[in-house]
Regions:
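Hydrophobic ligand-binding cavity/cleft-lining segments
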Residues: 7, 192, 282-289, 293-377, ...
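N-terminal Rossmann NAD(P)H-binding glycine-rich loop of SDR-like oxidoreductase domains
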Residues: 3-25
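NAD(P)H-binding glycine-rich loop region in Rossmannoid oxidoreductase-like domains
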Residues: 35-99, 109-115
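Conserved glycine-rich Rossmann-like NAD(P)H-binding loop of the short-chain dehydrogenase/reductase
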Residues: 25-32
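A conserved amphipathic terminal alpha-helix motif
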Residues: 440-442, 446-476
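Oxidoreductase cofactor-interface core, primarily capturing Rossmann-like NAD(P)-dependent enzymes
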Residues: 16, 23, 114-225, 242, ...
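Mid/C-terminal beta-alpha module of Rossmann-like enzyme folds, strongest
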Residues: 2, 194-254, 265-331
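Hydrophobic-ligand binding "helix-grip"
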Residues: 381-429, 437-441, 468
Length: 476
């Protein structure tokens, strides 16, 4: 089958593609920014650069698409996200109108008919909009998705691993029905072309109905940790959002959205989909165990932290590829090196649990200050310890370019600051070049740069020396 994928660079999309390729399908992947396209060069995978928020009649989809997956969500988008999601759905229908599309598979959230959060109500409205297309709609509604790198999993992990005693809001007693990411992908991949599922919606769920408190307790049990959890009715949604924001790696916008959704009970409607598709979901305990098995093997295929909703990043990567030369303040350093590959390995391992090789306390302090002002801080870390792709999050940086062939890494700062900042590493002819570039925004931007200049001297000097000297010692 020829299958169209939307949400290609998202958490689900990046994981679904290998499942569909293994099943022998040909894929046409829609991406907003071609620079962020995953699986480039893979057989049976092609890409179309398209922004579903804007309809462009000049963009044409292949007319021989058999099935499509609608995986676009704006969980923490600012502004009127409901309107944005409906615009995406309406534009999608316009794009596929000339296409001989037989089936659309939409991944939504479990609906509580008595009470809906804004985001789940938006998902429902999108489903109703998509029902009006020239295809058969299959909707899968999932609750909490448990997998390495998923927002819910990483937030629970942060809470359990960082806090021996938790003073928590009362919504921790809300019931939900989690499902493993592997089972979600199995349902999605097996749905393609199955006419029994045409024009139907199904809840997909694991066998356990749990409160969020029970999920935390089971998670702690898997990790071999003893945790005390105390729930208080006095924590307001705003206070709960700040609690999640400061303790976990989530952004405040996403924390607010999650808190609103977590107050609503989402328990699945029983159905026979499991028997129909021969997918038998594992329980929550095993889903957590499976997630850590992937983490321990450095096999995380995608993470919510790499999505643009984890920060305030706006626009395409190409907008930031050209580092400005005029009207900027710079810190440029270079060092002679003997072993280019070894130094490159160290550059490619920067951030996350590795840290920045020098002055990590100062880096952490800058990250803490960034969090206080509503920024991302250092808590996102990185998805993989040694692999980097354009578009990945790396602490409070966004990877703009990661080209091992040309031996260049370019990072763009997502910190809160009065200006824009780039950090570039480049190796050429046995020399390492390190460029820190800041484009100030007005007088405050210039004052900011000069106020941190003494720290920059130690940090950037120490960083380039550590990248080179540690390698040279090992070579010697």
């Amino acid at each position: 089958m020829k299958i169209l994928i939307t949400g290609t660079t998202g958490y689900i999309g990046k994981r679904l593609i290998p499942f569909l390729l293994k099943a022998g399908h040909e894929l046409v992947c829609c991406v907003r920014d071609i620079e962020r396209a995953p699986f480039k060069g893979k057989e049976r995978v092609s890409f179309i650069e398209i922004d579903f928020l804007k309809y462009d009649p000049a963009i044409k989809l292949p007319t021989d698409i058999d099935c499509a997956y609608y995986l676009m969500h704006s969980m923490s988008a600012s502004g009127d996200f409901g309107k944005m999601e409906l615009e995406c759905a309406e534009n999608f229908k316009k794009y596929v109108a000339p296409v001989n599309l037989k089936q659309l598979v939409y991944l939504s959230g479990i609906i509580n008919e008595k009470e809906l959060s804004k985001h789940l109500n938006s998902r429902k409205e999108v489903e109703e909009s998509l029902e009006g297309g020239n295809y058969a709609l299959t909707t899968f509604r999932a609750g909490i998705i448990v997998g390495s790198g998923s927002a819910s999993f990483e937030i629970i992990r942060d809470l359990v691993e960082k806090l021996p005693v938790m003073i928590t809001p009362k919504w921790l007693n809300t019931k939900t029905q989690p499902i493993s990411i592997r089972d979600v992908l199995s349902y999605l991949s097996k749905a393609a072309g199955d006419e029994r599922l045409y024009n139907n919606n199904y809840d997909i769920y694991g066998p356990d109905v749990l409160t969020y408190k029970q999920m935390l307790e089971i998670f702690a049990e898997v990790r071999g940790l003893k945790r005390k959890i105390i729930t208080l009715p006095i924590m307001t949604p705003k206070l709960s959002s700040y609690w999640l924001y400061f303790v976990t790696s989530t952004s405040y916008r996403l924390a607010s959205s999650l808190v609103e959704s977590m107050k609503v009970e989402v328990v699945a409607r029983p159905n026979h989909l499991s028997e129909m598709l021969q997918v038998f979901p594992v329980n929550y305990h095993d889903a957590v165990v499976n997630a850590f098995a992937v983490i321990n093997q450095d096999g995380i295929a995608s993470s919510w932290k790499d999505s643009m909703v984890s920060s305030h990043f706006a626009g395409k990567l190409s907008k930031y590829v050209k580092v400005p030369k005029y009207g900027v303040l710079q810190d440029n350093k270079e060092r002679d090196i003997k072993n280019e590959e070894k130094v490159l390995d160290r550059i490619w391992a920067l951030g996350g649990s590795t840290g920045w090789y020098y002055g990590n306390t100062l880096w952490k302090a800058r990250g803490f200050i960034d969090r206080l002002f509503g920024g991302t801080g250092l808590r996102r870390g990185r998805t993989h310890p040694s692999k980097i792709e354009a578009g990945d999050a790396l602490d409070f940086w966004r990877v703009i370019s990661a080209d091992r062939k040309s031996k260049r890494l370019l990072l763009y700062a997502e910190m809160r600051m009065p200006g824009e900042a780039w950090l570039e590493f480049k190796i050429k002819n046995n020399k390492l070049y390190q460029h820190a570039v800041f484009r100030p925004r007005g007088l405050w931007g210039r004052l900011y740069w000069y106020s941190v200049l003494p720290f920059h001297y130690f940090i950037f000097n120490g960083l380039i020396n550590s990248l080179v000297e540690d390698v040279e010692k090992k070579v010697a």
